[in-house]
Amino acid sequence: MHKIVLVGLLAWVAGIISVSAETLRVVSYNVENLFHPKHDTIWEPNPNPSLKGREIFIEKDDYEWTPDGERRWSYTRYYRKVENIARVLTNIGEWDGVDIVGLQEVENALCVKRLCYTLRPGEYDFVHYESPDPRGIDVALIYKKSRVDTIATRAIRVKPTPNPSLKGRGDELITRDILYVCAKIKAKSEGVKANGDTIHFFVCHLPSQRGGVAETEWKRDAVKKILQGGVDSVLAIDPQAKIVIMGDFNGEPQPSEGGGDPGDGLRGVSYQEPVNGKETGTHKYHGRWSCLDHFYTSPSLDSLSRAEIYNAAWIQEPDEKYLDLKPKRTYNGFRYQKDGFSDHLPILLKLKIKN
C-alpha cells in the first residue's frame, strides 16, 4: 500500500505567509447547503444489468430548500448566499484570486456555475458530477482557467455499502462521490516559463457523525478505502505523482502512522495547537472547535507548501452560549441570516510550484 503524507496542511499559521509569483492557492470549503431553489432531479444508470443503457429517474430530497419549503429558500436568499461565499473566496485570494477551490455541499452545476460567474466572470470554470446522495449535495472543483488545464476528470462512485456489524441487514451507506481531477498547472505571470506540473486532485466529503462518532465510523472508513484505492491507482502508474486530497473528513486528523486517514499507511501531522491561548478549528459544535477539514499531499510535492485556516472575524459571529466566536451560518436554527456564510471555516493551501 502506497503512503501519502499529511504535511502540516490542516493548520493555523500565525502571521502572513509571503507568496511567490508561482504560488498556487488551493482552497477547500464546505459551503453548507448551497442549494438551488428549484426542486432538482437526476438520471442515474440502471443498476440492473439486463436494463443496461436505460436510466432511472431519482428525485432529490431537497424540498426543504425550495421557496415553499421549511427554509423559505427564495432566489433572493440563494443569490445572496452565492455572493457571500464569493466574497470569502475573493478575500482569501487577495489581489490575484484563488486558483483552485474544492467545494463540499453544493447541489448541482447551476450553483457552481453561478459561483464562478460571481467570483470573476469568464475567469473560472468547474468540474461537477451528480452523485446519488439522497439530499442531492455533491462535491465540485472550481479552477482559474489562466492557471489550470484539466487533463482528466471523473466521479469515483462509493457503491451502496451495508453496515458490516449488521451483516448486511439494516443501515446502508449511500453517499457522495469522490471527485478526481488531473490538472496541468500553468505559470501565473508573463515571462515565467510554465513548468507544466501535473497534479492529481481528490475532493471528498465523508459521511457525518450524526448518530454517534463510533456508530458511524464504518461509513467514513468505507469511503476512505475507496479514496485510498484511487490514490493507489495514480501511484501505480507514477510513483512520484503529485497528489492533493482535500475536503471535509468529518473527523479529526490522525497524527500517527496507520491512523486511517484516508487509508492504511498514513502518517499525519495536525496543527491544532491554540493560538494566543485560544482553541482553533474549522467547525464548532457545543462550544468545542474541531478540525474536520483537511489537506493531504504526496511527498513529491514541495515541502515548503503551507496551509492555514481562514478565520477572519467577519465570517464569524459571537458565540453567546459558549463565548468567543463561531462560524456565521446562513441559518441559525431556522432563523435566516442574510450575511451568513457556512458552519465551516475554509482552509487554504499555498503550494510552491517550481519552475
What function would you assign to each model-found segment?
Residues 5-15:
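Bacterial N-terminal signal peptides
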Residues 19-118, 129-137, 189, 195, ...:
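N-terminal, active-site-proximal structural segment of metallo-dependent hydrolase catalytic domains
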Residues 25, 173, 186, 221, ...:
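Metal-dependent phosphoester-hydrolase catalytic domains
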Residues 25-33, 152-154, 198-208:
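Active-site-proximal beta-strand elements of phosphoester/diester hydrolases
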Residues 31, 106, 206, 248-249, ...:
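Active-site metal-binding loops of divalent metal-dependent hydrolases
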Residues 40-45, 196-225, 229:
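Metal-dependent phosphoester/phosphodiester hydrolase catalytic core
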Residues 100-102, 106-198:
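Structured beta-strand-rich core segments of catalytic domains in phosphoester-bond hydrolases
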Residues 108-110, 134-136, 209-211, 250-256, ...:
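Active-site environment of divalent metal-dependent phosphoester hydrolases
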